[in-house]
Amino acid sequence: VAGLVPRYREPGFGLARLTLLVPSSRAARTLSEAFIRHAGENGESGLLMPRMIAVGDLDLDEKLGAALDPLGAADIPPACDPVARWLTLDGLIAEERAAEGMEPLPGRARLNLAREMARTMDRLLVEEKSPEDLWSEPVLDQLGGLAVHWQHAIRLFARVNARWQAELAMRGQVDAATRRNMLFDRAARRWKEAPPPHPVVAAGVTSAALALARLLRVIAELPQGAVVLPDLDRDMSAEAWDELGRAGAADEPGGAVFAADDA
């Protein structure tokens, strides 16, 4: 906060023109409180806050699309309701187990399995993996004696997932994780083609999501963009600091804070 305020505050606008991408809603609240404390400690009666967008949570609400791309978010298919997905997966699991001649699961156990399958689907979508990757040779080698049981479980998962994807296509919907990836990729393309006229900073955002990583790469290369990674080692050697370039420090007052060759 102490670095963002002097760098991005503008007379009459405060930080209102700054877009700040943060990992979660909790981080946004913490930063809001930090901005307020900073203003009070510096004897300021008030400060226009930056626009903060939580991008790290998997279960993001519909505000993400409007925040990143207000003109194009409507072109992306809507996300399915998570409860509807959970209950649909429950029914698909029962049908697929019956088709395989397996013993029926009690209702609660089947719902728990449906919840775990939904989480696995989300993780695969976030990391842009397919169900086939779960029974690749490197994975099976790690499982040892459990490999046969694993293959049976993955076959059930693959069948349920295939039917669920067909159901989504029929509804004209996508999983929430898929929609999030599409929103990130659309924002990355638009910002790369037409950089926003205001500063954009991603602060403390780390994720296994490849789409989010692609967006962060674009932000880092924007004329007024920056990516602030967490856990910066303040005890790095002078050689490491030199490799970082300006690291956000202008050579002269009012000068550029980042150079093209900065790490």
Protein language model annotation of sequence segments:
Residues 1-263:
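Nucleic acid-machinery interaction/catalytic patches
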